[in-house]
Amino acid sequence: MIVGAMKAGTSTLHATLAQHPEIFMTKPKELHAWDMPTPPPVDSYHMHFERGRGFAIRGESTPSYAYHPGTMERLARYNPGLKLIFIMRDPVKRAISHINHSVRLRRLPEKDLFGELLADQRDMSRLDVKPFRPSPYGYHARGLCPPQISRNPRLSDASHIPLQP
């Protein structure tokens, strides 16, 4: 399971893993099965992995699993032995990429990036994004990795987790 910060490289890692002959990665990449307030029936979730029978590893990538409260706990109950890859990125570079992504999708008007960031700092309420509510201003909240990591009950002792810069 690949989780972590949006615009941190999850698509690239998903595509790279999918090229390995012993790894099956879902299509579509982001299933969003566990980041809803009520998860789907397990059978309907498992259907996404049917084509992966016979592979040594089957996986999916939904970055927002780390972001939405309760999701990591639901995943731990579903599969206590689930292997997680948590991707982080420099918060400033990630935020700029997120804003550019929102502009490309026309969720944000094409404006001066620096001006937008200053406006957000003046009106912090724009940055108060609520889980399960899409917002073009999520670039701030979705880049805060410590709260996302602390939501994972298996990361309470992170001494065994390798970190790569």
What are these regions (language model features)?
Residues M1-H68, R74-I87, P91-V129:
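PAPS-dependent sulfotransferase catalytic core
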Residues A15, E73, S150, R154:
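Surface-exposed charge patches
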Residues V42, M72, C145-I149:
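Short, well-ordered alpha-helical scaffold segments within catalytic/effector domains
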Residues R58-P63, F132-P165:
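Phosphate-binding beta-loop-alpha motif at adenosine-nucleotide cofactor sites
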